A protein has these predicted regions:
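Short loop/turn segments at strand-loop or loop-helix junctions that form parts
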Residues: 36-39, 179-185
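Charged helix-capping and loop-helix junction motifs
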Residues: 193-199
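Well-ordered alpha-helical segments embedded in enzymatic catalytic cores
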Residues: 19, 81, 110-114, 165, ...
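PLP-dependent aminotransferase-like
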Residues: 92-104, 109-112, 116-181, 188, ...
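Conserved small/polar residues in nucleotide/adenosyl-binding loops
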Residues: 202-204
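N-terminal small-domain helix-loop-helix segment of the aminotransferase-like
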Residues: 13-106
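Generic N-terminal amphipathic, Lys/Arg-enriched alpha-helix
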Residues: 2-8
Length: 204
């Protein structure tokens, strides 16, 4: 009788966020609210199909593009459109070739690819995540061997960003530090920087 190679593999701990969803599904209270996974639900409790997504799906289906392998960086036209959306079509960042864009498998997958790349470039650096942050971010960067620390971000008293403390934290970091910023929909607080604060941050 052979023993399975996986016989002694221990079960990983259950994901706490997905566990909240399981508890939500089991809850009988009709007024319950799901504050677990960061997914938008309509008033009917269902995930809506956004009109823009439906339109994009229909346009792609109508065009019937080839189904071969994509270039390593992904679809060039899509990457260019993303750069134009983020930086502006006439941005010098785009025009001078300083923006690099490639497609990845979702948000966490993209972070892992970035973490591996940064580990090869800056192996001795520390990664800084916001306080608080989504805990998976810490685990992801620690898994590739980075030391992970935090920078000041949220102020519970104002329920917003403590921008002065955040700027002080960033200014005190050593050279070649790696800072993980949430561009929007900060996880888990929902507190985002204003356009003026982003511009101020660029100069640190």
């Amino acid at each position: 009788m052979s023993t399975s190679l996986f016989a002694n593999v221990e079960m990983a701990p259950r994901d706490p966020i997905l566990g909240l969803t399981e508890a939500y599904n089991a809850e009988k209270n009709p007024a319950k609210v799901n504050l677990g996974v960061g997914v938008y639900f309509g008033d009917d409790g269902k995930i809506p199909l956004l009109a823009a997504v439906k339109q994009a799906e229909q346009a792609r289906l109508a065009a019937q593009p080839p189904r071969g392998y994509q270039p390593i960086e992904g679809t060039p036209a899509y990457n260019g459109a993303v750069q134009g959306l983020l930086f502006g079509k006439e941005s010098d960042i785009v025009g001078s070739g300083r923006a690099a864009t490639f497609q990845c498998l979702g948000g966490t997958g993209a972070l892992r690819v970035g973490a591996d790349y940064l580990k090869a470039l800056l192996p001795g650096s520390t990664v800084y995540i916001s306080d608080p942050s989504w805990e998976n971010h810490r685990q992801l960067f620690e898994a590739v061997g980075f030391k992970v620390d935090t920078y000041a971000y949220y102020d519970p008293a104002t329920r917003g960003v403590n921008f002065a403390a955040m700027k002080a934290s960033l200014a005190a970091m050593p050279p070649k530090s790696i800072v993980l910023l949430h561009a929007c929909c900060h996880n888990p607080t929902g507190a985002d920087l204003t356009a003026a604060q982003w511009l101020s941050l660029i100069h640190i």
